[in-house]
Amino acid sequence: MRKLSFLDRVVEEIDSYARFTKHPLNPNRKSPSANTVDGQLSDNDKKHAAGLMRVDYTGEICAQGLYRGQASVAKSAQTKEHLYHAADEEYDHLAWCAERLEELGAKPSLLNPFWYWASFGIGATAGSISDSLSYGFVVETEKQVMKHLDSHLKNLPVNDNRSREILKQMYLDESEHAVEAQKAGGKKLPKPVKAIMKLQSKVMTTLAYRF
């Protein structure tokens, strides 16, 4: 099997990015909201729900970038496979959020290309150091995503049942990813690194909610 050159890998990643940002997306799993009906939602309810779901969509874009960046330089085939599998599950989340945004009459954040490639760079940097550090980033990323999801579940409009079902399943999946990464040997990240990740996350959520 021919070994991919650096240029081949760049083209492959650009193609992958184009694939999972081209709508409509085709998830491997049916949306958790498929059999759920919303209650009455006002225009303000829809606007607020759309802002939260846009943040969650962008969070999944970041996770895709991080995982694919890590996988591109992973030391072992097992780690590479693990990360690509996690990215595939995150693809379902992207599709669910994209569908819900469309239902709410909204679009994904305009800044998603920046967040994806920034996350890809962070992932590739961490992955080039060691697989254990790479897994450590997965654990911390999933923990932060779970905090966002928990907050959004509490702040969604009361009658937004469809968004709620999506976020509940996403929370379960993210929790599983964190546990798997920890079992795979995830290294605890230094406090300064965690602080930077939290700051980046705060900036992302603030901007993505608005546009």
Swiss-Prot record:
Organism: Francisella philomiragia subsp. philomiragia (strain ATCC 25017 / CCUG 19701 / FSC 153 / O#319-036)
Membrane topology: Peripheral membrane protein
Pathway field: Cofactor biosynthesis; ubiquinone biosynthesis
EC numbers, comma separated: 1.14.99.60
Record function comment: Catalyzes the hydroxylation of 2-nonaprenyl-3-methyl-6-methoxy-1,4-benzoquinol during ubiquinone biosynthesis.
Protein name, UniProt field: 3-demethoxyubiquinol 3-hydroxylase
Cofactor(s) in the UniProt record: Fe cation
Cellular compartments per GO CC: plasma membrane
Entries under HAMAP family matching the protein: COQ7
Bias-annotated ranges (Polar residues): 28-42
Keywords from the UniProt entry: Cell membrane, Iron, Membrane, Metal-binding, Monooxygenase, Oxidoreductase, Ubiquinone biosynthesis
PANTHER family: 5-DEMETHOXYUBIQUINONE HYDROXYLASE, MITOCHONDRIAL, COENZYME Q10 BIOSYNTHESIS PROTEIN 7
Domain of life according to the entry: Bacteria
Cofactor note (record): Binds 2 iron ions per subunit.
Chief place of localization: membrane
Compartment annotation: Cell membrane
Family to which this protein belongs: Belongs to the COQ7 family.
GO process terms (BP): ubiquinone biosynthetic process
Region Disordered, residue ranges: 22-43
InterPro entries: COQ7_proteobact (IPR047809), Ferritin-like (IPR012347), Ferritin-like_SF (IPR009078), Ubq_synth_Coq7 (IPR011566)
Reactions accelerated catalytically: a 5-methoxy-2-methyl-3-(all-trans-polyprenyl)benzene-1,4-diol + AH2 + O2 = a 3-demethylubiquinol + A + H2O
Molecular function in Gene Ontology: 3-demethoxyubiquinol 3-hydroxylase activity; metal ion binding
Chain positions recorded as Fe cation 2 binding sites: E90, E142, E174, H177
List of residues binding Fe cation 1: E60, E90, H93, E174
Gene: coq7
